[in-house]
Amino acid sequence: MNMFFRLTALAGLLAIAGQTFAVEDITRADQIPVLKEETQHATVSERVTSRFTRSHYRQFDLDQAFSAKIFDRYLNLLDYSHNVLLASDVEQFAKKKTELGDELRSGKLDVFYDLYNLAQKRRFERYQYALSVLEKPMDFTGNDTYNLDRSKAPWPKNEAELNALWDSKVKFDELSLKLAGKTDKEIRETLTRRYKFAIRRLAQTNSEDVFSLAMTAFAREIDPHTNYLSPRNTEQFNTEMSLSLEGIGAVLQMDDDYTVINSMVAGGPAAKSKAISVGDKIVGVGQTGKPMVDVIGWRLDDVVALIKGPKGSKVRLEILPAGKGTKTRTVTLTRERIRLEDRAVKMSVKTVGKEKVGVLDIPGFYVG
C-alpha cells in the first residue's frame, strides 16, 4: 500500500486564495471549532489498521513501542517547530502515547482529536500574542538570533519562554519585510493581515483534517513512502495519474482570503473565454439555476470542489479583476475535459558535439 500525492488544487481547474471584502475576524478561542471524530472515521480506521498490519510489505507489530512512535510523529506533524505547544501539554498527552495502537484498532481516536484541539487553541493564542507584539515599536538594534529550524529543540517550559520565541519570530518577520524595502506602516499592515489570516484558517479546519493527519502519522511511521489519501486527495491523486480532469482549466491559489487565478491551461474554458486573466480573484461561484455562493475566506479545496463538475455543464464565476478600484463581473464557462499536457513525458533531441542525444523529461508518473 505504497501511496503518494501532491497537493495542487486542480479545479479542472487546478488550484492556489486573497482583497478585502468583509470576512469576519476570529477574536475569541470559542470561535475555533472543537473537532470530533465522525462516524465513518471509526470504520475507516479499523480497516486501514487491518490492512496495514496484515498486508504491508514491512512487517511490524502495532505494540506499545510502535504506538509511542506514532504519537511522536503525530506530535511533530502538529507542531514541527516546537513553538506552539508547551512542555506540560506534551507531557499530559505523552501518558497516553502507548494507547494509540488500541485506538487505531477500535476506531476511537480520542487522543488524536484531543491533542489536535489543544494545538488549535494554543496556535490561536500564539497568533493573538503575535498581533499584540506588532503594536510595539520595532527595534533592530539588538544582537538577536532566530532559530529557523526548531524541530529538534525542546518544547518551551512555560508561557514566558513561548512568548520569547514569538517575540523573535515577529521580529524576524518584520526584519524580512524591512530588508525587502517595506516601510514600518506596510510591515505592520502585511503582518497583521498574515497573522489574522492564519487565525481564520484555524476556524476552517474540519474533522477530516484531524483524521487524515492521524492516518498519515501512522502510515509514515511504517514507511516514509506510505500515505493515507482522504476521499478528496484520492480524487486529486487519480487526476495526477490520468493527466486529465473535468473543469475550467485554471490553476488557482490562495492569497489571504481570496482564490486567485495563478495560471490557465492553454485551450481550456478559462483561457478561451478571454474574460479571465492571471491575477483575477474568484469571489463567487454559481451553478446552473442556483444563486451565486460567496467564497471569500473559503478553504481552497472547498472552492475547487464547487468549481469542478462534469463535462458540458456550466458554472458561473464572479470575478474581481486584478488591480485596484475594479468592479466584479460574472463569467459563465462550460466545463470541458482538460488534458494536462504540461505534465506528460516529453522527448527532445539535442546535439552534443557531433552526436545527437535523446532527452526524456519526466515531470511525474502517471497511467496511460
Which residues does each PLM region occupy?
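Acidic/histidine-rich, surface-exposed loop or edge segments in extracytoplasmic proteins
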Residues: 24-34, 45-57, 95-99, 193-197, ...
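Cleavable N-terminal signal peptides
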Residues: 9-11, 20-21
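Boundary at the C-terminal end of the N-terminal hydrophobic targeting segment
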Residues: 20-22, 29, 189, 205
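Bacterial N-terminal signal peptides that target proteins for export
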Residues: 1-8
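Cleft-lining beta-strand/loop regions that shape enzyme active-site pockets
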Residues: 22, 36-37, 53-62, 200-207, ...
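N-terminal-proximal low-complexity accessory segments that begin disordered
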Residues: 37-79, 89
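PDZ/PDZ-like domain segments forming the peptide/carboxylate-binding groove
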Residues: 76-77, 98, 112, 117-128, ...
